[in-house]
Amino acid sequence: IFDIKTTEGEGIESKGIMTINKGDFNIEAYDDGINAIGKLYINGGELYIISSSNDAIDTNDALTITGGMIIAIGSREPEGGIDADVNTFKITGGTILGLGGATSKPTASACTQNSIIFSGTNANLIIHIQSSDAEEALTYEVPASVSTILYSSAKLKTGATYQMYN
């Protein structure tokens, strides 16, 4: 278990490529929770990341997520839950919830797992995402007011319509 709390600076930073394969991460950072100057690969693990003044996950290069359970909560716009600048953001597995003022959009041509982006909600409200045929995709209590919600999971079916309630 990695329990990281900062009152200044990043939670975890790499000047090159960063790869996370497994582990439990609880990161509460003033600046970016996870920051990679190079490519960032998340292949597994359970990550709960919150930034009080910047992005929860930030890479200046491509971001690839193949597995894991990720909750990434960034601060207000223009900061976000997940920031891959304008680089490739590839999702092929895992469960990802990105909350914040903004989010990078997954690169559709690179992804093999579906994602959805919703407008935000207020703090301490429970959001419920479900398909038009009432199949639950997610229920989660949002700890802070956010403008953007990104969700990706194997539960999201191609061609289905999803709505968020709170």
Map each language-model feature to its residues.
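A composition-driven surface/loop motif
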Residues: 1-166
